[in-house]
Structures are given as structure tokens and as C-alpha cells.
Amino acid sequence: MNPFKWLIILPVRFYQLFISPILGPRCRFYPTCSHYTIEAVQQHGVFCGLWLAIKRIAKCHPGNPGGVDPVPSCGCHSDKETTPKEKSDNA
């Protein structure tokens, strides 16, 4: 794994193992913000993953009802490829 990813993931794992059990469940979302952060960094890399995590943590407050909020899929590997026919139709 990329060493820069570990710089993000290790503090989150520390939080999950040692701090979260003391504080108790507080996250309003599933997966929790800490799990979301790890998954986002693993899927999208350090910069995009960290940005997604920051946006998610900013939404986790008493004014937001929470709910299921999975990590979005990466937009760089689109399933829909543009065919030559579509290109000529758009021209």
C-alpha cells in the first residue's frame, strides 16, 4: 500500500481502536465516518479520499439526520464508453 495512504489510515485506525470505544457510538451515518475515511482513501487515493472524508465529517452533526452514505464510486473508470456512432451523432 502507498505509504501516504498509511499516513491517513493509521491515525484513523488508532481512533477506531482506542478513542471510539471510550466515546461510544456517535456517528449518524453508515458506514461510520472513520470507516468511510479508510474506504475513501483506499478507493480514491490520498487527496480525493481525504477530501471526501472532510466533506463527510462536516455533514456529521446533530442537524443532519444521517443515514446510509457510501463512498461514491470512482468516476475515472466509466462503464459507458463513447462509441464512434455516438461521436458522429453529437457532431
Swiss-Prot record:
Membrane topology field: Peripheral membrane protein
Compartments (UniProt record): Cell inner membrane
Compositional bias annotation for Basic and acidic residues: 77-91
Gene Ontology CC annotation, any one: plasma membrane
Region (Disordered): 66-91
Record-annotated disulphide pairs: none
Stated role: Could be involved in insertion of integral membrane proteins into the membrane.
HAMAP family documented for this protein: UPF0161_YidD (MF_00386)
NCBIfam families on file: membrane protein insertion efficiency factor YidD
PANTHER family reported in the protein's UniProt record: MEMBRANE PROTEIN INSERTION EFFICIENCY FACTOR-RELATED
Family that this chain belongs to: Belongs to the UPF0161 family.
Protein name from the UniProt record: Putative membrane protein insertion efficiency factor
Upper classification of the organism: Bacteria, Pseudomonadati, Pseudomonadota, Gammaproteobacteria, Thiotrichales
